[in-house]
Amino acid sequence: MKYRIFLSDFDGTLVRADGTISQTNKNAIAAYRAAGGVFAVCTGRMLASILPRLKELGIEDGLVVAYQGATVADVRTGALLKNDGFEQADALRILDLLEDDGHHAHVYTVQDVYCNRDDDALRAYERVCGVKVRIVRGERLSARVKREGMRVVKILAMVEPDARRPLMEKLKKALGDGFYVTTSSDCLVEVMPAGQSKAAAVDFLSEYYHVPRAEIAAIGDQLNDVPMVARAGGRFAVGNAEPELKAIARVVSSVEEDGVAEALQIAAGE
């Protein structure tokens, strides 16, 4: 087997536009695992959102990576092997920046997600992710975080597609090098502590399974997947990926055409 570990993004890579996962991809994952390969999903989603979807893939053991690499959990037990997050002062600063500009913002702990706005965009988010968001009313998100002493894992802003990159640049300029600003879709901007990108997942799995990075493959579609793919030995991008990711990876079929299955065949040396 050429690559003994295979890390895959979820939305836009495994999950098609209609929210489903193809049987071809499911079969390819099962075959790769049956041959001795370790397959792990690495997503920006929270654990409560991704764990139920793993059952669709027939994955009932192993590890799953959530929150852009900040959290690693045991699939069978839900036990946390890694759970990093913000210093509270940093989380408050980021939330104040977003709320001062009137953005639709989310703040995540390892178990829950809170939002400052109840609207159609939030309803759509809940449907896609399969989670119930806690609406904060009568106070700012930053005030709730401070009052309850929340340990924040991730902060997100929902935006119109044409506002995504401008907000990313604004946050990068305002926050500096101590934070990681990225995007996981055309309407989401996400902020993590510096060093908590999906590249951290490659390093974690390499150490956990005692497999060198040269024998780890990764695939994705969005800018938040670039660090993971760049860190891996086998670099893949689905055909619908962002140009920045395609530039550093071997491009396979799109998510709608079972690109993950194609990459898994290559990873297995077929």
Positions of PLM-derived features:
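Hydrophobic packing residues within well-ordered alpha-helices of enzyme cores
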Residues: 25, 50-54, 167, 171, ...
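Active-site phosphate-binding/coordination module
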Residues: 23-125
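Conserved acidic, metal-coordinating active-site core of Asp-based
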Residues: 97, 101-104, 108-219, 223, ...
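Asp-based phosphoryl-transfer active-site loop
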Residues: 2-18, 94, 229
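Short, structured coil segments at secondary-structure junctions
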Residues: 57-60, 67-68, 175-177, 231-232, ...
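Short active-site oxyanion
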Residues: 36-40, 60-62, 154, 214-215, ...
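Mg2+-dependent phosphoryl-transfer enzymes with acidic/Ser/Thr/Gly-rich catalytic loops
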Residues: 1-5, 22, 190-270
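Short, acidic loop-to-helix structural element flanking the phosphoryl-transfer center
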Residues: 19-36, 83-91, 138-139, 195-207, ...
